[in-house]
Every structure is written in C-alpha cells, then in structure tokens.
Amino acid sequence: MPIRIAAPHPRVRTLAGALTCVALLTTPAHAVPITVQDATGKPLPTVMVSRQPVQAAAVDTSDNGYPASAKPQQAYVELARFTDAQGQADIPAAEHPWKIRLRKPGYQDQSLLAADLGSKPIVMAAESDPAALAEQQPANAWSSTIDFANAALKKEFMLQCNFCHQQGGAMLRRERSADDWDSAIKRMVRYGARLSTEGQKTIPALLEAHWKKIHANPALVPAGTPWNPALAQATIRELPIGDSMSQMHDLLLHTNGMVYVGDNLQDRVYEVDPATGKYTVYKIPPRPGDQLGGLLAGRLRDFPKHETYQGIHSLAESPKDGHIFITPSYQRRLIEFDPQTKAFRYHEMDSGFYPHTLRFDAKDRVWFTLALSNQVGMYDRAANKFTLYDLPFRSLMERITVKLTPFIFKLLGWGIPVANYVKVDHVSTGVPLPYGIDVTPDGKAWIARLHTDEIASVDPDSGKVTMIKTPFSAPRRLRSDRDGNLWIVAFNASQIARYTPSTGQFLRLDLPVVPKGSDTPYSLNVDRARHQVWVNGTNSDSVYRYDIATQAWSMFPMQRRVTFTRDVEISPKGQVYVTSASFPSWHIEDAQPTLIEITPR
C-alpha cells in the first residue's frame, strides 16, 4: 500500500507550468542600476553582481534540522547578473534586507548593503597578491597543476577522486602530510572509489609534495576560463535548500512546473516552485526492516549525520500520469511518488544491486542502470514486472567479484573495511559500472559503462545487448538528441562526444575550458527544441552550452566556488536547472547547497 503524507492542496498542472515559464520575468518592479569601474575610472565589464540576503530566510528545522514533511517553506532567492561593456547591470530589488557582492577574477571582492549603494559608480580594486589571485581561481585551475610524471595515473586520479567532490577546491588543496592523504584515500575507497592499489600507495606522497610546492609558489596556479562579455545577457537565480549535511544529487523539472530535488544523504525530496522560492519537503519513510545505510550500511559509517535508508539518486517523470520514479541506490527497489497525493509507493526487486540512473520510454516503462550488479533494468508498470538484462563481463574474475558485491558490502556493514584490503587494478576489474542511461526516439535504451570505456544498447523487443567501445575514457552520463544521436560526457577527458547510431561514428569535442583539458564533465542534457547541449562543468564552477548548428560554445560561471553539479534539466522556455551537489556539501564556499536556474538571455 502507498504511504500518504498530508499535503497542501494539489496544484493545477498547467497553471504551475505557466508560472515556471515566466519565473525570470516575474521580478519586483523596482530595479537598482549598478555601475562598476576600476581605479582609473574605466568601466568594468563581466563583473558578477550577486544579490544576496543579509540574513538567510528562517525555515523550519523541527525534523532533525530539516523542515517537517509537507510543511511549506519560503526561501530567499539569490540573483546574479553580469555588467555590460559600460560596466552596468540592473539588479531587481528584493522584498527582504539584501546586499550585493561584486566578483571578477583579478579584482578584490566587494560587498555592499543595498542601503549603501547610492548613485555613484562602485570602484573595484585590482588584486595584486599572488596568493589571493590564486584563491580566486576555480578548482580546475588548481588541479591542472598536478603532475605525477605519469599522465595515465593523473587521469585515473581525476576519475576516481573526483567522483563526489572537486579536486583542487579549497578543502582538497590544503597542505597535508602523506599520512593524512593516505587516511583520506582509504576513507574514499570505503565510500566506493576504485583508485588502483598502485595509486593508493604512491599518490599520498605525491600530493604532499605537490601542494607544498604550489602553496609556496601560488603564481604557478593559472587563470581559469575567461568570462565572456555575452554574459551580460544572462541571469542566474539560486535557491538555498538543505544544509551542509545534505547532498542534492539529481533533479527533475516536472510538467507541473515544479522542480524536484533528491537529498541523497537525508532521504528527502524537495518540491520547489522556482518562480517564488517556495518549497516543501517530503521525507521518504523507511520500510519495515530497512536499516540505516540500507544495503550499504558500512559506507557512511564515518559520516557525521545522515538519515539514509534509501539513498535517493535519480528522478524521472512518467509520460502517462506524471508520477515520479526514484532510484534508491541503497535498496533493491524503485520508489514511486505521486506529486498530487504526495504518496510514496515501493516496487521491490529480488535481485540487482545499486539502482542508479533511470529514464522512461514512450510506453511508460522505466529503464535504469544497476551500477554494481552490471545490469540494465526495466520495470513495466502495466504488467508490474521487472526484467533485468545482464551486461558482459571482461573476465571471469570480474564475474566473480560482481557476484560477491552484496557480500562485500555486508562485511563493510559489519565494520570490516574489506574494500581497503582488495587489490584494485588500473581498469577497475570487478566494477564495470553501468552508469548513465537514456532512451532514443526508436525505443532503444542506451547506457554508458564508466569503467570499461563502452556504451551499450538494449533492444526492448529482442532483448539483445550490443556493446560499443568508445574512443575516449570514462563515458559517464548520456542523452539523446531529437535525431536519435547520443551525446556523452567523457568525464576525465574533459570532452563531450556525439555518437551517431546510423553510422557508428563518434565526434569528440573539447570543452572550452582553460586550462585546456582540466574539467571533469559529470553529465549533460540536450535541449531538443533549440538543438543545444548543456554540460556540467563539475570541476570548474560552471555550466557549458554547445550549439549543435553553429558549433559555438558558451560558459556560465556559478556564484559559489565549489559548485559541483551532476545533472541538468531544461525548461520549455530554455531555462536551465542544476543543483550544487558536492559530497560533502561543506566543501561549498558557504557550505550551502542550492538549486540554480540559468536564463541565458
């Protein structure tokens, strides 16, 4: 039986959808003109002007530090615009006490209360201190300096040690001893990273020496990607949700106009109205017999605070009735959420391990990856039936390891750090890791298998699985465009790629990141209406846009440093949504995860 939670009156889908479409058009009538100059009186373009509340909105924290389930909350929406060639930007006034923060690489940050703005230009002072200039750069600029004298080991490090958080961010570039790095890597391996045994042994001393050198010579940190003057047309809105113990992993823009965000560490779904900043939290109740930490109870043993029974990962909307399906990675089930009644329903599986990313097909079937059992799953809602498709193994040893995975995690749950005792090779034998998934217009399900450098298709009629080797490493998540082509992120290659099924050809595209090759794109999505690809700049505090027709790139910097994003959603009007999803969230500049909305123009 579904579990129901008392809820506000259901919204009318079409009305709410219309509200989202005008989210960025609905601002207070009074806009404050901002003019920014340098010390010589010259206009300063591409200054990020952020409107921030003087104090965060008061929200309910009665449920272990979070809002009570089904109790509406009101957050303060933050907003950022960029100055034009004349150094000017208009900032809509807020209805609460607010301030602005000015940020531009090469200049000192400034903050002013709204009451102190006046009519005179604001002067930004140039920054000359090498250490301060280095601190302004995003994580990718810092991580680009890492040199192990072994390019393959560096790529492996960026693949395995960038899974959950940035490399080169403020927390990960501090000077530490080799022993401290060794302890951190052991903890990371218990969380599930597959850094090779060789890397686990050699990298701690290399990191100790490297960051000691960089902190002694901060001028070695290069500049990040330049901010383009076209940013003057963009608006970025940001809504704080959750806290430093949250992880806002994936999100879904629903046809009812709401954005749904899953807190992976606290088993809560946030239902957000992006037009107003109002949101409601719905806590997923554990089933009888569920244990804290689920089937991976030992994984979060060292984490200070979590309520993870499910481990919310991916969300997708049914094309039939608008219900939301969720992958709970720490269980053998799918979770169904009715946005109108607010009821949760559980669909149990008797096999498979770690349900990961999911998508619907046109027949209202749910396709999903099972990351640790090397399978693709399909749930037929009409028949109430699961079908699992086995993917091939690379070796007998891998087959044995995958079959033993549930037992290995049981040992971890008993406090035995078996992951730290197992020998790991450079290609992660034993954990092939089927990851992202999408369905092309012809009905085929396509997956990316991260550790084997492959994509695969599943024919729903015949059940045939076809494996295809990629000419790049670490295909992570993928999406289909309107023509049935697949767009894939190459995580540690700092690229995206297009695969054309009709020809079997790959087209590889470098991200426009500076320094070249320094980003780790986690995911992407395709705006089919505008024929554009939006890409997570996961290690660079940015989101990229690639226009397929013109082959032009754009880059949109985020307001907070250490904005680690994992997913992209696109509205019918072209707004783009991401979440700041670092694990842990206290790595974020102010330790505050957010829902972010980008309007390009």
At which residue positions do the language-model features occur?
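Structural motif
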Residues: V32-P45, N64
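Short, acidic Ser/Thr/Gly-rich low-complexity loop/linker segments typical of extracellular
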Residues: Q55-P92
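A short, solvent-exposed loop/turn motif at the edges and junctions
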Residues: Y76, W98-L113
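The canonical Cys-X-X-Cys-His
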Residues: F157-G168, I203
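Beta-rich, blade/repeat-based domains predominating
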Residues: S244-T255, P288-P319, S351-K363, S395-P441, ...
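Conserved beta-strand positions in repeat-built beta-propeller and related beta-rich domains
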Residues: V259-L265, T308-Q310, S318, I324-Y330, ...
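Short loop/turn segments that connect beta-strands within beta-propeller blades
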Residues: D273-G277, D338-K342, D380-N384, D459-G463, ...
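Blade-level signature of beta-propeller repeat domains, shared across WD40, Kelch, NHL, RCC1
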Residues: T565-R601
